[in-house]
A protein has these predicted regions:
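Charged DNA-binding/catalytic regions of mobile-element recombinases
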Residues: 2, 27, 65-327
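Residue-centric detector for conserved, function-critical "anchor" positions
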Residues: 1-83, 251, 324-327
């Protein structure tokens, strides 16, 4: 038969310690009179001495004053946790149920919050928040090789400054009961979206319009390298003439090799898994407005990017300007 372990209230522990501290009992005498193990009594005596000196213990307090402090601290902890829960829920909702614990942690740290991924994960679990997981991604494959346009970039995705290398690609979006086509231009330096266009036709006009937007918004840079897959739109005379007019060089991925344009694939993966409704959009105008909000707002300015050590692309560029004095 196992011996049942004795439990003691804080009041009993305090009175036992007072026998030693206030009434002159030795540790051995007090322990013997109360039927205690002397080592336990010594712990209580030490704790009571510390509490009388103003130290709040990690274990349950013995004095009424320190018990009150512990109650207040527990209340503050509860209020703080409720505040953090509320912020986690706000960020999760704003991200359309897509952000995971790492992304939310980065967002909160950027706001000045001292919080780790374990706590964020715990708060998400309490709130029953489950990040949407992206499904499989189907890559387009070119059917015609373009030996006249080499893969100059050759997966050198790390560049030293903005407006040195841009990437482009096209994806499809369901809106108004039919497919629409989205062309995006990405600056590789901080993975910032610098231009985009949406159309009902995946033609040369679409990619030219996205390039025109990027060219104007970025101050008409020249001499940069534009990289894309081997889609016919990017190999069209219309697009290549526009590159020539803007004094841009052209690079193309190898046929059927999606990894040669991996940064663009990631943008589209994030857009579709995090933002676009699974049923698509009711109208083309709604798609235009919502996709623009994601690319130029949420993706560029809010969403943390691992490539930028948790900074959103636009903020990573701003940081470069601050450090280097660029205008």
């Amino acid at each position: 038969m196992t011996k049942q372990r004795r439990t003691f209230t804080p009041e009993f522990k305090r009175e036992a310690a007072c026998l030693v501290l206030d009434q002159g009992y030795s540790h051995a005498e007090a322990a013997r009179s109360l039927g205690l193990v002397e080592s336990a009594l010594r712990r209580w005596v030490n704790q009571l001495q510390q509490e009388r000196g103003g130290v709040t213990p990690a274990s349950k307090a013995l004095t009424p004053e320190q018990q009150k402090i512990q109650e207040l601290e527990a209340r503050i902890t509860r209020v703080e946790r409720l505040r953090l829960r509320s912020r986690v829920n706000e960020l999760f909702t704003r991200g359309r149920s897509a952000p995971g614990s790492r992304t939310i942690m980065a967002m909160m740290q950027e706001e000045g919050e001292q919080i780790g991924r374990f706590k964020v994960r715990s708060l998400m679990r309490e709130l029953a928040l489950i990040s949407k997981q992206p499904g499989s991604h189907a890559y387009k494959k070119a059917t015609v090789e373009r030996p006249d346009i080499p893969n100059t970039l050759n997966r050198a995705f790390d560049v030293e400054a903005p407006n040195q290398v841009w990437c482009g690609d096209i994806t499809y979006v369901w809106a108004q009961g039919k497919w629409h086509y989205l062309a995006v231009v990405l600056d590789l330096y901080a993975r910032r979206v610098v231009g985009w266009a949406l159309s009902e036709k995946p033609d040369g006009d679409l990619v030219v319009k996205a390039l025109d937007v990027a060219y104007e918004q970025r101050g008409k840079p020249q001499g940069l390298l534009f990289h894309s897959d081997q889609g016919s739109q990017y190999g069209s005379r219309q697009f290549r003439q526009r590159l020539w007019r803007y004094r841009m060089r052209q690079s193309m991925s190898r046929r059927g090799n999606c990894w040669d344009n991996a940064p663009m694939e990631r943008v589209f993966r994030s857009l579709k898994s995090e933002w676009i409704p699974t049923t698509g959009y009711l109208t083309g105008q709604q798609a235009q407005r919502d996709i623009g909000q994601y690319l130029m707002g949420h993706y560029n300015w809010i969403r943390p990017h691992q490539f930028n050590d948790g900074l959103a692309p636009a903020k990573a560029e701003e940081k470069l300007k601050t450090v280097s004095g660029m205008s």
